[in-house]
Regions:
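Hydrophobic targeting/anchoring helices
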Residues: 71-84, 179-185, 309, 315-485, ...
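Short acidic, Pro/Gly- and aromatic-enriched capping/linker segments at domain boundaries
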Residues: 79-104, 234-243, 615-631, 723-727, ...
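Mature N-terminal, pre-catalytic/accessory segment of carbohydrate-active enzymes
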Residues: 1-142, 188, 199-206, 214-215, ...
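Polysaccharide-binding and catalytic clefts of secreted carbohydrate-active enzymes
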Residues: 178-351
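A conserved amphipathic helix/loop scaffold
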Residues: 519-745
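Catalytic domains of carbohydrate-active enzymes, especially glycoside hydrolases
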Residues: 115-154, 339-344, 380-391, 489, ...
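A short, well-structured beta->alpha microelement
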Residues: 118-124, 322-325, 489-509
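Aromatic-lined substrate-binding rim segments of carbohydrate-active enzymes
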Residues: 122-188, 205-208, 301-308
Length: 745
């Protein structure tokens, strides 16, 4: 009772100070967070039966007490001229924003959008943007799981058997199966190849576009997301045969690649996922075909929309599948982005890192990347903007509880005001971050759009070459695990690290890169391999992580090792203890470390190991048993580093930094930790904006980081742009899971 009375008194005093500040014309948005949270804490929060309600209440009251007092102190300090005011611009009018150079813009300035889902007209817009950035309809399918009975596709599905999917009973949002969330009804799993399906979809699109004609209050028209598609109908078989004929022209050429004896393309079967491992060359073509035919349907959908709506930017996608073994069933984000259908790149990130926004940023070109339903962790919202996102709507903030069929009861644990798992401090952080994203849009966009001189290869061939059934249980496979692991380990190296693709490499993307990393990219097409090696000869630096470049896209052995003068004597598997097939972050700690030294730096590797033979002069480091750990070759004006085993994260950061220095990439900012602290998990980058140097520092750990910043450029002082407090003596405290943005003056 005493704590509640104290908190209520502090909130009352803050309310009075807010009123006075408003009368002075002072910004009060940050201070208003705590009175609003008090209403949430007292009227909306749920508690699980196993929780200590008294302890939960004390925690909430303590937060409100401390927050209210600090907010009052800040208002008073600003009024007395002792602190700078953090002035937040108004929320943008979506009808007046333009798309230009990867962002939604008001004039020249980027308008970054941080919204909470399902809040389009509420008091929450004091802090968060309107989450209705787009108007949405399941146009690709002609309906969704909620409204299918009211759409033309329903009648077609009842009347024409060829509208029914064949050989695949998972709707994946096209349209409804027995496991569909929040709805009860008979399965409606459509075939997109049927003319009756296409006719019904076209009618639905016409109706939808007529209803939304003249819309000027949204940024984009969303043709929906979370789509995946597979069908084994007769029309698909005919499409498959025609696709193969266009690709190969002569079936003998295809037979030579597949090691088969088909008499014609019409006799080539449609492989099932469980058969993928039996003929991986044939599977690669089938998986490629499935991606292609789905993108073609998306293009057709876009053409139908453009009959009625010629201008509104469109978006659609299933980016989740870009990092999933089921990639072959989804929408190919690269081909979709290059197709001209979309004006905004759609994102939906579930992962606990920034790999997806970084990948989509690499594909987007001048299109903004917008996450329409962010399911990641709160502390990576701001880093996601710093990796290229232009807009994010976070899941979710519902103002009233309700229940619908097939909805898991624990879904309410993810709604911010009701959740008993999301602490009240996270609500306060989200509200502060939303204000800072709006206030610092120019600086965040500059940091997020800076050039990436280092790139990791996102290999579509590797994604398609994984037999789905082999990786379905754990949701990953060696290439995908290596890509994510190396990407995350690279973040604390102080260097801009992006992604490139096989298609982009063939289009000359490496001309803007200094370093390319192959993260276990085993299956790489020959022309891509050759383009990479030519780039190295011209002065590039290549890091090859095992088991890259061992085969082509059809899983046929590659001659890369021979071309490089290397020989693999054998491959020693990782000593996994529980029957696993992949080394991941979850089992790596159980494995022995393999130490070696290169260029005076002691490093450790983990997992499988390649035993290589090469010229002695090319060995840059050896394991303790004398086996080469790193091979370094000079090729023309460039350098190639071949790692015989995967480095553990801290060693990878050291190795990447060492290679970067040798390639002429010296970080402009050095970040070290004060005694008793660590900078090991601090991600940081530096860029320039209109003559100013800017940096962000993201502390991706559960401990506060006491940092020392040293620059390679001259400056008079440093300013923490989030707090508007000076960084004295280059010493900066970054709390756990927080991000600082610093201006060097």
């Amino acid at each position: 009772r005493a704590l509640r009375a104290e908190a209520e008194q502090a909130l009352a005093e803050l309310d009075a100070e807010i009123s006075q500040a408003k009368a002075r014309g002072q910004e009060t948005a940050y201070a208003e967070i705590y009175p609003y949270l008090a209403q949430v804490a007292f009227h909306s929060r749920l508690a699980a039966f196993w929780q200590d309600r008294a302890a939960e209440q004390r925690q909430a009251l303590s937060l409100l007490l401390a927050g209210a007092r600090e907010a009052k102190r800040e208002l008073v300090a600003v009024a007395q001229g002792k602190a700078a005011a953090r002035v937040v611009p108004p929320l943008p009018d979506y009808g007046k924003l333009e798309i230009r150079d990867g962002y939604f813009r008001s004039g020249a300035d980027p308008a970054l959008i941080f919204a909470m889902l399902y809040n389009d007209h509420s008091a929450l817009q004091r802090w968060f943007a309107n989450s209705e950035t787009g108007y949405e309809g399941a146009l690709v399918a002609g309906g969704d799981r909620f409204n299918v009975e009211r759409q033309p596709i329903w009648q077609a599905y009842q009347q024409y058997p060829d509208t029914h999917r064949v050989g695949w009973d998972n709707a994946s949002a096209l349209i409804r199966d027995e496991g569909s969330w929040e709805v009860i009804g008979p399965p409606v799993i459509i075939c997109l190849e049927s003319p009756h399906t296409l006719d019904a979809i076209a009618k639905m699109i016409e109706q939808f576009e007529r209803e939304h004609a003249g819309d000027r209050s949204h940024l984009v028209q969303n043709m929906d997301f979370e789509y995946a598609y597979v069908c084994y109908c007769e029309r698909t078989r005919q499409m498959w045969a025609r696709w193969l004929e266009r690709k190969y022209a002569d079936v003998r050429k295809a037979n030579a690649i597949w090691a088969t004896t088909f008499e014609g393309f019409s006799s080539v079967p449609m492989p099932r996922p469980e058969q993928a491992g039996k003929n991986r060359a044939l599977w690669f073509d089938w998986a490629s075909f499935n991606l292609n035919r789905f993108v073609n349907h998306i293009k057709w959908t876009g053409e139908q929309v453009r009959r009625w709506e010629p201008r509104k930017p469109l978006t659609v996608g299933s980016p989740y599948y870009a990092f999933d073994p089921a990639f072959w069933t989804g929408i190919d984000a690269e081909e979709l982005t290059d197709s001209g259908v979309t004006g905004v790149v759609l994102e939906e990130n579930y992962a606990l890192d920034t790999l997806m926004p970084e990948y989509l940023h690499a594909l987007a070109g001048h299109q903004p990347v917008e996450d329409f339903e962010y399911h990641g962790v709160l502390h990576q919202i701001l880093p996601s903007f710093l990796h290229g996102d232009a807009a994010i709507s976070m899941w979710w903030w519902n103002s009233a509880m309700h229940w619908t069929p097939n909805e898991p009861i624990n879904e309410w644990t993810t709604s911010f005001p009701q959740s008993y798992t999301i602490p009240l401090s996270d609500l306060a952080k989200a509200m502060r971050d939303a204000l800072d994203v709006r206030r610092l849009g120019r600086e965040i966009a500059a940091l997020g759009s800076a050039p990436r001189p280092i790139a990791l290869l996102y290999s579509k061939s590797c994604m398609l070459q994984q037999p789905p059934k082999e990786s379905a249980e754990i949701g990953t496979f060696p290439y995908l695990s290596s890509l994510r692991g190396i990407y995350n380990a690279s973040q604390a190296a102080g260097l801009y690290v992006g992604l490139t693709t096989e298609k982009k490499i063939l289009s000359g993307d490496l001309a803007q890169r200094k370093i390319l990393v192959l993260p276990g990219a085993e299956f790489v097409p020959g022309p891509v391999r050759d383009a990479i090696l030519d780039w190295v000869d011209g002065g590039g630096t290549l890091i090859v992580s095992p088991d890259s470049l061992l085969a082509d896209e059809y899983a046929r052995p590659s001659d890369t090792l021979g071309k490089l003068g290397l020989k693999m004597v054998r491959r020693e598997p990782a000593p996994l203890k529980h029957g696993e097939t992949v080394v991941t972050e979850y089992n790596a700690d159980e494995l022995p470390r393999m130490a070696f030294t290169t260029n005076g730096v002691r490093l450790e590797a983990v997992g499988a190991r390649q035993v290589l033979e090469c010229a002695k002069t090319e060995v840059s480091g050896r394991f303790q048993d004398g086996v080469p750990a790193v091979v370094r070759q000079g090729r023309g004006r460039g350098q190639l580093y071949w790692l015989a085993a995967t480095l553990e994260p801290a060693s990878w950061r050291q190795f990447l930094s060492m290679v970067a220095r040798q390639a002429g990439l010296e970080p402009e900012l050095q970040v070290t930790a004060e005694a008793g602290s660590t900078a090991e998990y601090v991600e940081y980058r530096v860029t320039e904006l209109q003559g100013r140097h800017l940096a962000y520092l993201y502390n991706n750990s559960d401990r506060e980081a006491h940092l020392i910043l040293k620059t390679a450029f001259a400056h008079r002082g440093m300013l923490d742009l989030r707090s508007l407090a000076p960084v004295e003596g280059g010493r900066l405290l970054v709390p756990a899971r927080e991000t600082a943005i610093v201006e060097f003056q």
